[in-house]
């Protein structure tokens, strides 16, 4: 036990973290969020340590794994990340907490072991949704991820799109977006995802990525990848510092993909983009919305993506927002099980990772029972969205502005009545009262119930 224990500490300390900010003299001084980089050959880990005013901290690894830290643990994490020798770290603990040397050394070694397992085992930035150690128990003062809908313009016209804005919706200037990125960094937001609309239609996207990278933020792109068919453009995004990309592929059947996109020829351009990013250093995943239009092609689509070499595939149900409220092709939660069983089997056989995004009512579909992880609504908690005009939304499909990032205080946005209502699960269905898994389930997506009422879905069988 002690030998393995020592190996855990040693493996951590022999792969030093490179600080991307100037070294801080003390634990208390410096910025609210600190960014560290650890490189081991071609592998790279990006660690963010976010410190709260009360001394508590949050350790975020590759924007996917999260560990909430009490003040003592936050201090020990800082010691490790700063590259402090174990002997000096133990002395610092003794001086700070007035504890015996034996206790300080044991506590530090124990924490270092847990720390090492988290940082060594964290999946690179594939899971774009938060995977909290204690699901939904943490109450941060700002989200860990912010989606930036930098434009609502798009070169597709998806019939099921959750976008509820006009395509000519006002847009911030490049300089204004720079200011937003700086403000988010000061708030302690380490993960930025550029989305839309279609974010690649903004010519300043590489500049925005470069600015976020200079701050220390991890950056991702949600895209239809049509512009990524240009390899020179892909290289420009990579050189700017882009970390990961998620590409929408609705079907392996070109006619069905193009029908859902309402854009003839979109499939060929998207797949060309997929092939380009797979040849780049980017972390790559795809996402597919399961509808009655394409559900019969999902098994073949999964095989197609595996043959392309896509390492991670995401699936989600219809989002009941924007055109999704009226498209009439959504599946009931109770219909998801058979197709997700197939997806789990196929991705497992091909060595891929499967990500399921949609928060569901666990009494209708329980993702934990299907080895898909805890999925609950994280709106106004772990993730939020800023629209192209600066309005802040609970999430990118919940079109009820909480304020504007340029004109309203963050405190008023974070503590808006709707923000609190969503975080504290204050509007759950009556049947959820007393449920033992309500903390994880959260009653499912708050937009789905309204969508069911408007769509008046009937329980149709899933086509296999």
Descriptions of predicted regions:
Residues 150-157, 380, 432-439:
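Cysteine-centered iron-sulfur cluster-binding motifs in ferredoxin-type domains/subunits
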Residues 238-240, 248-250, 255-393, 397, ...:
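Radical SAM enzyme [4Fe-4S]-AdoMet core and its adjacent flexible, acidic
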Residues 123-143, 359-366, 401-427:
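Short, charged low-complexity linear segments at domain edges
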Residues 1-78:
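Acidic, low-complexity/disordered tracts enriched in E/D and polar residues
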Residues 41, 392, 397-464:
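Flexible mid-to-C-terminal extensions adjoining Fe-S/redox cofactors in radical SAM and related proteins
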Residues 88, 96, 102, 106, ...:
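Conserved alpha-helical substructure of the radical SAM core
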Residues 2-13, 18, 65-147:
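Long, charge-rich, low-complexity alpha-helical segments
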Residues 105-129, 348, 386-414:
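A broadly conserved sequence feature marking short terminus-proximal activation segments
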